[in-house]
Amino acid sequence: MATNFFIQPITEEAEAYYPPSVITNKRKDLGVDVYCCSDLVLQPGLNIVRLHIKVACEHMGKKCGFKIMARSSMCTYERLLILANGIGLIDPGYVGELMLKIINLGDTPVQIWAKECLVQLVAQGDHVPDHINILKRNQIFPLFAPTPRGEGRFGSTGEAGIMRT
């Protein structure tokens, strides 16, 4: 049934690339491409990349997690870029800005241009999204309400997930 992504720009830069709209996934693509919102230079080694957006996903009316996966264009003959953790797994309760850990495996810096898409979002369970809803920057939206998981990034809970006691 219905799977939807909700993308909210959190900076003025992101607003330029994500105008409020509802996009119907007519081609039934599994992944939702995500833009870089500014020009970047990725140095050799580990780089942290801000995406300037918050994202939520729901399936059948219930909030669900999603994955961040590299697009095939991220690693080419001209540039050797990978996501540091292979696939980013975003918990349903995470309500903060999306960020990437990208490793430049090359010996030289790599230029990334604004509006270039390096990654895509895939809904938990690999459900094909029906709609991508782009929200206004300061819009109050229930799926971004504070949660116990919150906005902490990159393993910030310091706990071992469902196995903790």
Curated annotation (Swiss-Prot):
The record describes its quaternary structure and partners as:
Homotrimer.
Predominantly, its location class is host cell
Q: What is this protein called?
A: Deoxyuridine 5'-triphosphate nucleotidohydrolase
Q: One biological process GO term for this chain?
A: nucleotide metabolic process
What Pfam family is a match, any one?
A: dUTPase
Question: MF terms per GO, please?
Answer: dUTP diphosphatase activity; metal ion binding
Q: What induces it?
A: Expressed in the early phase of the viral replicative cycle.
Q: Which cofactor does it need?
A: Mg(2+)
Q: What does this protein do?
A: The viral dUTPase may play a role in lowering the dUTP concentration in natural infections to minimize misincorporation of deoxyuridine into the viral DNA and ensure the fidelity of genome replication.
Q: Which UniProt key words apply to this protein? A: Early protein, Host cytoplasm, Hydrolase, Magnesium, Metal-binding, Nucleotide metabolism, Virion
Q: Name one GO cellular component term.
A: virion component
Q: Which family does it belong to?
A: Belongs to the dUTPase family.
* Reaction equation(s) it catalyzes: dUTP + H2O = dUMP + diphosphate + H(+)
